[in-house]
Amino acid sequence: MTNMTPVALGLAALLALAGCANQVQAPAAASQSVAPVQVYAAGSLRGALNAVASDYEARTGQKIALTYGPSGLLRERLEKGEQAQLFASADTEHPQRLASAGGWQAPSVFVRNGLCALTSEKVNATPATLLDTLLRADVRVGSSTPKSDPSGDYTWALFRKADSVQAGAYARLDSKTLKLAGAADSPKPPDGISVYGWLMDQGRADVFLTYCTNAVVAQKEVPRLKVVQVPPELQVAAAYGLTLRLGASPSVTAFAQALLAPPAQAVFRRFGFSLP
C-alpha cells in the first residue's frame, strides 16, 4: 500500500467527499439556473482565486460568488450564520474550528505561502540583516492583526523564532509592532488597491511583514517599495486550509475538487503560492 502524508490524507478525504476525481462532474454549461457557489476566502488569495474561478465559470457555466477578507473575521461571520458553502482560509485553525463545532468538513491544505518583508526605500535590509533591521528603534514595523488575520499569527510566530536567534527579540518586537491591517476597524484602502502597498505608501510603517504573495503585489503597485526574503531560521510556513459544508451540493464539491486539480494548482503557483 502506498504511504500517504497527513496532508495527502486530507486531500484524499476531500476528494472522497467530492465523490472522487473520476465520478464528480462539473455542472453543465447549460445549467444556468444553478445557484452560485458561495465562497469565503482569505484576502491573500484574491488574484489567484479570481483567475481560477473565472476559468471555471467559462468552462462549466457554474457561477462562483467570491467574498474576501481576513480569515478570522470570515470565520466569525460563518459562525453567526452567514451561508457560504466553501471556506478557503490562510490557515487551518479557523476552518478546523468550524469543523469542530459541527457542520463542516475537516480542512485540507490546498496551497502554501510564506512571509516576506515589504520595506520602504529608506530601509536597506537584506535577509541576513532583516532581524537587526526589525529590532532597530528607528524602524516602524507593521503587521496584520493576530487572531483576526492569520498573517498576524504567522508574524508573531516569526517573532518567537527570532527569540531563539537573539535573546529578548520577541519582547521587543511584540511591544513595537503596529497592528495596521486585518482587524474589523483597520483602515481600508480604496477598492482594488493592495492594503499593504497603500499603508506603506501612506508612510504608516517602514517595514511590513506579510505574505510573500501580498508583498509582490504591493511592490508592483508601489515600485519604490522593496521585497526582502525572510531568512530560513525565521521563516514560518503558511498552510492554507480548505473546507466545505457537510452534505454540500454537487456544484460545491465539484468546485472544491477543481481547486485541488492540476490546472488550478498551476494558477496558484503562477501567483507565487507553493504546492500543498
What are these regions (language model features)?
Residues 1-10:
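Bacterial N-terminal signal peptides that target proteins for export
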Residues 8-9, 106, 231-233:
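Residues embedded in well-ordered secondary-structure elements
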Residues 13-14:
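Residue-level signal for mature regions of secreted extracellular proteins and peptides
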Residues 17-19:
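C-terminal motif of bacterial Sec signal peptides marking the signal peptidase cleavage site
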Residues 21-67, 71-72, 76-80, 91-92, ...:
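Exported/periplasmic ABC-transporter solute-binding proteins
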Residues 102-108:
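Central helical "cap/lid" subdomain
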